[in-house]
Amino acid sequence: MKRFFALFLSAMIAVTMSAQDKKYSDHYYKRYNEFEKEAPIVKWDIVLLGDSLTEGGEWSEYFPGTQAKLNKKGGAIRNRGIVGDTAEGIYDRLDQILPGKPKKLLFLCGANDVSHDLSADVIVERIEKVLRRIKKESPKTKIYLQSMLPFNESFKRYKKLDGKTHMVAEVNARLEKLAKELKITFINLHPLFLEEGTQSLNPKITGDGLHLKKEGYEIWREAIAKYVK
């Protein structure tokens, strides 16, 4: 009886610690587990890696010709975006991607890092950590570093982004410099999404000041079309 009680108590402590130690959101772990159940990444795959902006895209549908060609080789366009993810969270799930040595990887993140009150220095350092790991563990993967997209504070939906519009341009300038240093392709999406005469996301292509409507994804699709093939 004492042994049973001891085991029960140990289990309860473990569960409690697990709940306390949970590093990311429930959605993060849900998506992570979904990825685990999918077919593994292979060398023909094109991976789009990022946060909610990436998760919200129907990438294989945007590029049906490329998807069909990849399917013939056993590959696919793979959406590896997770709502709320950060550079740190992305780093922690690279083990689901890099062993497959994908053909191409298009990477975008930063908005959630900004909302967590991280400095531009820290954000860029964490993104650099992700990029260097990709280059080290999958050196033949063609990496495309996409700039942060603008957001629009006037919607007043995301309080943690208030007063931080200026950070986007600051981070992007450093990311462009980093891309040159690492000899990877930088895709500057930022100006394509701006409201004319401002540094804010065009309100016509967003419903909440951060995430994109269909029209926004069409702009994105056109901007990366030459890389997703």
Cite the ranges covered by each PLM segment.
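Hydrophobic h-region of N-terminal signal peptides that target proteins for export
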Residues: 10-18
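Sec-dependent signal peptide recognition
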Residues: 2-10
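Alpha-helical cap/lid subdomain in secreted, periplasmic
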Residues: 67, 72-76, 92-229
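Serine-esterase "nucleophile elbow" of acetyl-processing enzymes
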Residues: 19-101, 200
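Single-residue recognition of alpha-helix boundary sites
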Residues: 13-14, 62, 158, 224
